[in-house]
Amino acid sequence: MMKRQFEDVTRIVIKIGTSSLVLPTGKINLEKIDQLAFVISSLMNKGKEVILVSSGAMGFGLDILKMEKRPTNLAKQQAVSSVGQVAMMSLYSQIFAHYQTNVSQILLTRDVVVFPESLANVTNAFESLISLGIVPIVNENDAVSVDEMDHATKFGDNDRLSAVVAGITKADLLIMLSDIDGLFDKNPTIYEDAQLRSHVAVVTQEIIASAGGAGSKFGTGGMLSKIQSAQMVFENKGQMVLMNGANPRDILRVLEGQPLGTWFKQIEEVTHD
């Protein structure tokens, strides 16, 4: 039995997806956001350093503009995300303030982390904010990101973005909150006998092949992008927990070593009972 030990974890990146922030009705899940702010603030009070990678701009924008479906037109998608990003950050700021925690916004595009000078600048920004006891809230800059062959500036989705941020900031742990319990050996929505994988030490071709499917109507991420994110984390000698975000307080249980979700950690670094 692999024993999870997170006592030495100081810097944590938490990624929350749109499906965890927006209710099936399209309305904002205020209770979930409040719980998340409480948990992060509690961790900060214990001396942890937390960076939040938050999707949700599109979901917030759809709610504000009273649009039932995600636009298919790119320009309209960018407009909706732009409106939603402001609303999302406003809400985060209000709720975190209730717990005496200050937040900041960092919007990234892929080219920022590709070029050395801009990468150094954004790294310094993260370090400065963290040193001030501020929670950086990161999202992709959807209003200006493009995905064209000659000038691709999109990360693809925030699963990959969270892995990039974990690498940039040299985080001790990436916690990815989703609408699933973790990585299963097969699709649990199809197979009743699907088993949750408690620990993954190597991302095999079998695991990659078993991952697939799209995200929700509000988001873009699927299981494959989470597996690819785990690969990126491994490349940076990091570790990741993929878990259900239904109850953000479960983050505290994970950090206590409870075996929730799927723990991605290379086997040579695993401590045995």
Swiss-Prot record:
Its EC number is 2.7.2.11. Keywords: Amino-acid biosynthesis, ATP-binding, Cytoplasm, Kinase, Nucleotide-binding, Proline biosynthesis, Transferase. It comes from the Bacteria. PROSITE patterns: GLUTAMATE_5_KINASE (PS00902). One of its GO terms (cellular component) is cytosol. The keyword Hydrolase does not apply. Pathway: Amino-acid biosynthesis; L-proline biosynthesis; L-glutamate 5-semialdehyde from L-glutamate: step 1/2. The keyword DNA damage does not apply. It is found in: Cytoplasm. ATP binds at K15, S178, D179, T220, G221, G222, M223, L224, S225, K226. It catalyses: L-glutamate + ATP = L-glutamyl 5-phosphate + ADP. GO terms for biological process: L-proline biosynthetic process. CDD domains: AAK_G5K_ProB (cd04242). Gene3D superfamilies: Acetylglutamate kinase-like (3.40.1160.10). GO terms for molecular function: ATP binding; glutamate 5-kinase activity. Substrate binds at S55, D142, N158. Catalyzes the transfer of a phosphate group to glutamate to form L-glutamate 5-phosphate. Belongs to the glutamate 5-kinase family. NCBIfam families: proB (TIGR01027). This is Glutamate 5-kinase. It comes from Streptococcus pyogenes serotype M18 (strain MGAS8232). The lineage of its organism: Bacteria, Bacillati, Bacillota, Bacilli, Lactobacillales.
